[in-house]
Amino acid sequence: MDFYWRWTGKLQVLPFYHTVSDHPLPHFSELKYYRSKKRFLDDLDFFTSHFENVSMAEVGKEKKSFHLSFDDGMAEMYSVVFPILQEKNLDATFFINTDFVDNKCMFISHKISLLQHELKKSSQNRQRISGYLECETGAIHSYLNKINSEKADEIAKLIHLDFTEYLKQHQPYLTTKQIITLKNAGFTIGNHGKSHRNFNTLTFEEQKNEIETVNSFLKQWGVDDLFFCFPYGDYKIKNELFHWMYQEGGIEKSFGISGLKEDGFPRHHHRILMEHENFSAEEIIRSEYLYFMLKSVLNKNKIRR
């Protein structure tokens, strides 16, 4: 790694995950955004061998370090990830969406994964859904990826899939009690927006509401330092929101998902998605450094808005 560090000057990496599981459940199995437990443990071995694990307070300081984060507040954060991090004495941040806490409702992407899972089980379901969507059965998957939550609910009724019952049975998200336990154990609890909506589709007022609502919950849970991670990344987000976050919104640091990148806002940091199951952490991180080096030659390694 020494060559990459010397060439780029980028000493800190920010790997992130959604969940860790050897038995992916239907609400995320079709999304491919998960890491097996073995891969995750191998990742941690790589990171701890080459970098120092640091707290959120040290994110942005250029030293050979890494900070882990996990998005969407999924239940495996408590049942799988939490014990591993405690055993290895590693710091991390959990970014949550308050709409899903205590399994009150389901994230649209998880609804779509469930629908896609059901498609595999029944040709009758495929026919019903293709009729509803007015598309060929072979095009159902691409159509489903474009629907909103209300459409997903309507389609679920067609094939007798009950999202509310699934939430009760499987409890896919963290509970308030679990979040407070994580916080009391020394982990950072961060803001991932109220409902995981894509911020580049929202008005400025809607964006602020998504952030402020979660900030209020975090303060009730005793969280003093506020950090925000954009759902779906920060593509096409206007400078106006960044200025508001830092000056009025109480956000100390914010995060995107663009990999190893520089940013025009020094308090905004980019993370590296680790959920590429066929690749090791070393392969993923080296590829990020190589891509950064290529972009720097073209003067495109810094995000400008």
Predicted regions and their residues:
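Alpha-helical scaffold elements lining the catalytic groove of polysaccharide deacetylases
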Residues: 170-188, 195-221
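C-terminal active-site subregion of NodB/CE4 polysaccharide deacetylases
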Residues: 2-69, 107, 113-115, 201-305
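Short amphipathic alpha-helices and their capping/turn segments at secondary-structure boundaries
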Residues: 2-7, 82-87, 173-184
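Extended, charge-rich helix/loop segments that form flexible
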Residues: 104-185
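Membrane-embedded segments
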Residues: 69, 73-81
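A short alpha/beta connector and helix-capping loop motif
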Residues: 80-98
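Glycine-enriched alpha-helix->loop->beta-strand junction motifs that scaffold or abut catalytic
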Residues: 88-90, 185-189, 247-253
